[in-house]
């Protein structure tokens, strides 16, 4: 693989955070002049390498904006079902939980909702030590999507009712843009 392909792969893997120039120089074992030359000669049909300060980021070209906006709009129309929202709330406040625990709380089979939440990356199944079962818990993506740093930041019944209403309003209006 040539250096362009390696840079592209590294920046793709780094995602929105990009990579610091020093990291690229170190990994590629090249000097700054060679890196600048590689970046300026990089060509791709839909991607571009941009520099922000000392950080390089792989991003889409401006010409792709209308298509990307259309994709985002389509994804924003994919809301979570009421069952998925209920299941997510139960898991968030009571984690870790087994599927049977969720069904006891909801009073109905929740397999479909659990599958949806796992597919969206909002929850994950972890192996329970010394057992063949799994426990469901929220993911870091859940925290990111709902704008909280840690699970303890969820509003509690002791907190202001308006804050809880706002949180659950945001939860219910969650567009499902989790990929």
Curated annotation (Swiss-Prot):
Q: Which GO terms describe its biological process?
A: cell division; chromosome separation; DNA replication
Where is this gene product found?
A: Cytoplasm
The superkingdom of the source organism is Bacteria
Q: Which UniProt keywords apply?
A: Cell cycle, Cell division, Chromosome partition, Cytoplasm
A GO cellular component term found in this entry reads: cytoplasm
Q: Which PANTHER family match?
A: SEGREGATION AND CONDENSATION PROTEIN B
Q: What does this protein do?
A: Participates in chromosomal partition during cell division. May act via the formation of a condensin-like complex containing Smc and ScpA that pull DNA away from mid-cell into both cell halves.
Q: What family does the Swiss-Prot or TrEMBL record give for this protein?
A: Belongs to the ScpB family.
Q: How is the quaternary structure described?
A: Homodimer. Homodimerization may be required to stabilize the binding of ScpA to the Smc head domains. Component of a cohesin-like complex composed of ScpA, ScpB and the Smc homodimer, in which ScpA and ScpB bind to the head domain of Smc. The presence of the three proteins is required for the association of the complex with DNA.
Q: What is this protein called?
A: Segregation and condensation protein B
The organism is: Staphylococcus haemolyticus (strain JCSC1435)
The opening ranks of the lineage are:
Bacteria, Bacillati, Bacillota, Bacilli, Bacillales
**Gene expressing this chain:** scpB
């Amino acid at each position: 693989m040539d250096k362009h392909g390696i840079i592209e792969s590294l920046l793709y893997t780094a995602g929105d955070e990009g990579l610091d120039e020093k990291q690229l120089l170190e990994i590629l074992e090249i000097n700054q002049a060679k890196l600048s030359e590689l970046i300026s000669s990089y060509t791709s049909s839909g991607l571009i390498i941009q520099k922000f300060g000392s950080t390089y980021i792989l991003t889409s070209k401006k010409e792709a904006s209308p298509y990307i906006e259309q994709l985002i709009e389509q994804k924003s129309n994919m809301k979570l079902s009421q069952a998925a929202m209920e299941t997510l709330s139960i898991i968030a406040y009571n984690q870790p939980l087994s599927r049977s625990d969720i069904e006891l709380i909801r009073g109905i089979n929740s397999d479909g909702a659990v599958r949806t939440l796992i597919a969206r990356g909002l929850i994950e199944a972890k192996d329970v030590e010394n057992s063949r079962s799994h426990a469901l818990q929220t993911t870091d993506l859940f925290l990111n999507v709902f704008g909280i740093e840690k699970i303890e930041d969820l509003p509690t019944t002791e907190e202001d009712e308006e804050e809880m209403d706002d949180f659950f309003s945001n939860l219910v209006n969650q567009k499902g843009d989790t990929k």
